[in-house]
Swiss-Prot record:
Membrane spanning residue stretches: 442-462
Any matching Pfam family: DUF3403
PANTHER family named among the record's database cross-references: BULB-TYPE LECTIN DOMAIN-CONTAINING PROTEIN (PTHR32444), S GLYCOPROTEIN (PTHR32444:SF89)
Function statement: Involved in the regulation of cellular expansion and differentiation.
Subunit description: Interacts with PUB9, PUB13, PUB14 and PUB38.
Residues in the signal sequence: 1-26
Record keywords: ATP-binding, Cell membrane, Disulfide bond, EGF-like domain, Glycoprotein, Kinase, Lectin, Membrane, Nucleotide-binding, Receptor, Serine/threonine-protein kinase, Signal, Transferase, Transmembrane, Transmembrane helix
Disulfide bonds: 296-308, 302-316, 378-403, 382-388
Name of the protein this chain belongs to: Receptor-like serine/threonine-protein kinase SD1-8
Lineage: Eukaryota, Viridiplantae, Streptophyta, Embryophyta, Tracheophyta
Entry-listed glycosylation sites: 43, 118, 242, 387, 437
Domain of life according to the entry: Eukaryota
Xref: SUPFAM superfamilies: alpha-D-mannose-specific plant lectins (SSF51110), Protein kinase-like (PK-like) (SSF56112)
């Protein structure tokens, strides 16, 4: 027994030795006391009780700057949800978090505070403690009071780019905070970016997505179930949404009812609002929802008194009783000028309301709310106010309750196929549907004659309407000229009028038809001074109408490889498509033996004119290129997934990407595009069309094309944007490889950055090495030889926009060393077993290269 004290003495000494040797374990699991500190060098962290979240220092990507932040510990992919010193990073690996003078502070190498909770005043008697809670909230509180009233400061009051469950977005009267989320500057730069998501408390509260000082997207007000502008926001088994409006707070939040489900709402550095859920089996974040989704989500897309409907073409429509403010511009598919009343209101003169169903309510920042009355009382209230222009229920649950009224103009309205709610817009008596019924009552004793006249009017009206819908402008048949009816196969209704009537069925489409003389005048008789470019199809000219409207005229040459079929195809497809990243077709011309397409004029012409011109590509810094990549990806996703049709472009290349004055990319040239059914995944053709260097192997060799063919072309384009080198015609003096081969070789050798355009590295303010390497990796994934290995465009966008998304390692690309075109009459070829064929060594029945 005499040796027992010596054993305990030795054990105690060993225990204290371990504490000295491993200081990382000197801090409690989820708290930091006033006597403790967190340092970068010790690699200490604080972990929430349920091991879901972790707080510590980190540096993103390959940067040398350090930040204090919170991330998910329970999942395999490092995902940051909060950053303390996002705009004041530590410049070296020396940094400390501690409690000092009743504040949490982050100190740099000289013990100078770079971040603090900035609490002032108050009588703090007991010691303070910092604690990381189970929900990811980092709090500073009284060490003797763990109740909510003991909290002096919390990270949930200062969000960065992520809204977590139980975190509140919006205004709190007690603290005076209006909490909002703001994007990172880039995927590997946590500093404050350009985009923010804020709750507007004025009028009928709603949330806006901002790009600096400009509104981009609006959620619509909360209608008791969901936001008016988010119809897909349905109740879920494990997710509960909450919107609170009271004197104490106006906030939005959500909570998760299952502890093993992780979800977050975040805003990407490119301005995309996204909800993610963690998929354990895939070990990845799944994009559950995102906004803006389409052109109709763009703020004020159709101006005042106009509404947007993605299922009509054009997407902009005037509310019943209104007409386009500028018919000519409206006819050219620019709805920003909005609409005006056909008949002015007459207060007390029989005004009424037209009921619009399944609508996103107009902007409500200046609207008035009365939650104590119903829809009938709301209607009377609006009628009594001569300035009232519309009303709706504030709560759509049950039979509806509450009242919101608008005075002044109505804007940012859209119609949904499902969801939305009823909106009642005030009209003059003469514009109401039941005007004929009221007239019949006034006639009284002459009802018989009135009915006869009324029936005659209806018959005449219907006859005129039928005539209007069936009219097609037919041009004389001169030589090989085709009638416009035959040309467009009755799928596009051609109108000679600039104003497009909205009386036609939404399945039809009216496209303005311009006369040859009008186009010739607009282009100064197709002068060389107006020439913008030239291709296998013909020449593109700049034109200007008498009202100053600029346009681009694509004039097909008589010998164009883009023949009548391609012309019809382009008109049918692009006339029905509406997206910010697709070029807009304004009109067409089939006259005097000519075929011409009239597009919106884009000031910065095509991407290739900037990318491959050394005198012009100097302004293409990395941020601009990254935005162009994202825009092209969104446009392609719209074609593949989000449009009314599933469309394969088949000719995606740099010269078919046009740039507007803001350098927003727009996909053009749909002459080779094909429509797929929703259940179709691929098709086969004996006529291979497209451009060498952009065609996928399976398409070039076997005529098989699918969405993955476009993905391949996108991958080539992405790598061209990064390198400013063409895939076709690329030459490397050391090895006879095309661009894809060069990128692949450098990637395997760990020299991925060597292919970057030096212009990018010179613009140090926007050069983000880690982000560029991710893009190169994504590009290589897109150009993999086997179509099934390539990602979908939805996954591409997810990988581009989310730093937390895992990117797999790419396999070898499908690329070529030389071109060998064989007899075009042959449909197959033989090769020896020892021959190594490449993508461009192909045999096809008919080959059209442009």
């Amino acid at each position: 027994m005499r040796g027992l004290p010596n054993f305990y003495h030795s054990y105690t000494f060993f225990f204290f030795f371990l504490l000295i040797l491993f200081p990382a374990y000197s801090i409690s699991a989820n708290t930091l006391s006033a006597s403790e500190s967190l340092t970068i060098s010790s690699n200490n962290t604080i972990v929430s009780p349920g091991n879901v979240f972790e707080l510590g220092f980190f540096k993103p990507g390959l940067d040398s700057r350090w930040y204090l932040g919170i991330w998910y510990k329970a999942i395999s992919k490092r995902t940051y949800v909060w950053v303390a010193n996002r705009d004041t990073p530590l410049s070296s690996s020396i940094g400390t978090l501690k409690i000092s003078d009743s504040n949490l502070v982050v100190l740099d190498q000289s013990d100078t505070p770079v971040w603090s909770t900035n609490l002032t005043g108050g009588d703090v008697r007991s010691p303070l403690v910092a604690e990381l809670l189970d929900n990811g909230n980092f709090v500073l509180r009284d060490s003797k009071n763990s109740a909510p009233d003991g909290v002096l400061w919390q990270s949930f009051d200062f969000p960065t780019d992520t809204l977590l469950p139980e975190m509140k977005l919006g205004w709190d009267a007690k603290t005076g905070f209006n909490r909002f989320i703001r994007s990172w500057k880039s995927p590997d730069d946590p500093s404050s970016g350009d985009f923010s998501f804020k709750l507007e408390t004025e009028g009928f509260p709603e949330i806006f997505l901002w790009n600096r000082e400009s509104r981009m997207y609006r959620s619509g007000p909360w209608n008791g179930i969901r936001f008016s502008g988010v119809p897909e926001m349905q109740p879920f088994e494990y997710m509960v949404f909450n919107f609170t409006t009271s004197k104490e707070e106006v906030t939005y939040s959500f909570r998760i009812t299952k502890s093993d489900v992780y979800s977050r709402l975040s805003i990407s550095s490119s301005g995309l609002l996204q909800r993610f859920t963690w998929i354990e089996t895939a070990q990845n974040w799944n994009q559950f929802w995102y906004a803006p989704k389409d052109q109709c989500d763009e703020y004020k897309e159709c101006g005042v008194y106009g509404y947007c409907d993605s299922n009509t073409s054009p997407v902009c429509n005037c509310i019943k009783g209104f007409k386009p403010r500028n018919p000519q511009v409206w006819g050219l598919r620019d709805g920003s000028d909005g609409c005006v009343r056909k008949t002015l209101l007459s207060c007390g003169g029989g005004d009424g309301f037209v009921r619009l169903k399944k609508m996103k309510l107009p902007d409500t920042t200046t609207a008035s709310v009365d939650r104590g009355i119903g829809v009938k009382e709301c209607e009377q209230k609006c009628l009594r106010d001569c300035n009232c222009t519309a009303f709706a229920n504030t709560d759509i649950r049950g039979s509806g309750s509450g009242c919101v009224t608008w005075t002044g103009e109505l804007f940012d309205i859209r119609n949904y196929a499902k969801g939305g709610q009823d909106l009642y817009v005030r009209l003059a008596a003469t514009d109401l549907e039941d005007k004929r019924n009221r007239s019949a009552k006034i006639i009284g004793s002459s009802i018989g004659v009135s009915v006869l006249l009324l029936l005659s009017f209806i018959i005449f009206f219907l006859w005129k309407r039928k005539q209007k819908r069936s009219i097609l402008i037919e041009t004389p048949i001169v030589d090989h000229q085709l009638r416009s009816r035959d040309l467009l196969m009755n799928e596009v209704v051609i109108s000679s009028r600039r104003h497009i009537s909205r009386e036609n069925n939404t399945d039809d489409l009216e496209l303005p038809l311009m006369e040859f003389e009008e186009v010739a005048m607009a282009t100064n008789n197709f002068s060389n001074a107006n020439k913008l470019g030239q291709g296998g199809f013909g020449i593109v000219y700049k034109g200007k109408l008498l009202d100053g409207q600029e346009m681009a005229v694509k004039r097909l040459s008589k010998t164009s490889v883009q023949g009548t079929d391609e012309f019809k195809n382009e008109v049918k497809l692009i006339a029905r498509l509406q997206h910010i990243n697709l070029v807009r077709l304004l009109a067409c011309c089939v006259d005097a033996g000519e075929k011409m397409l009239i597009y919106e004029y884009l000031e910065n012409l095509s991407l290739d004119s900037h990318l491959f011109d050394k005198s012009r590509n100097s302004k293409l810094n990395w941020q601009m290129r990254f935005d162009i990549i994202n825009g092209i990806a969104r446009g392609l996703l719209y074609l593949h997934q989000d449009s009314r049709f599933r469309i394969i472009h088949r000719d995606l290349k740099a010269s078919n990407i046009l740039l507007d004055k803001y350098m927003t990319p727009k996909i053009s040239d749909f002459g080779m595009a094909r429509i797929f059914g929703r259940d179709e995944t691929e098709a086969n053709t004996r006529k291979v069309v497209g451009t060498y260097g952009y065609m996928s192997p399976e398409y070039a060799m076997d005529g098989i094309f699918s969405m993955k063919s476009d993905v391949f072309s996108f991958g080539v384009l992405l790598l061209e944007i990064i390198s400013s080198k063409r895939n076709k015609g690329f030459y490397n003096s050391d090895r006879d490889l095309n661009l894809l081969g060069c990128v692949w070789r450098n990637w395997k050798e760990g020299k991925g950055l060597e292919i970057i355009d030096p212009i990018i590295t010179d613009s140090s303010s926007t050069f983000r090495q880690h982000e560029i390497l991710r893009c190169i990796q994504i590009g290589l994934l897109c150009v993999q030889e086997r179509a099934e290995d390539r990602p979908t465009m939805s996954l591409v966008i997810l990988m581009l926009g989310s730093e937390s998304t895992t990117i797999p390692q790419p396999k070898a690309p499908g690329y070529c060393l030389e071109r060998s075109l064989l007899d075009t009459d042959s449909s197959s070829s033989k090769q020896r077993d020892d021959e190594s064929w490449t993508v461009n060594q192909i045999t096809v029945s008919v080959l059209d290269a442009r």
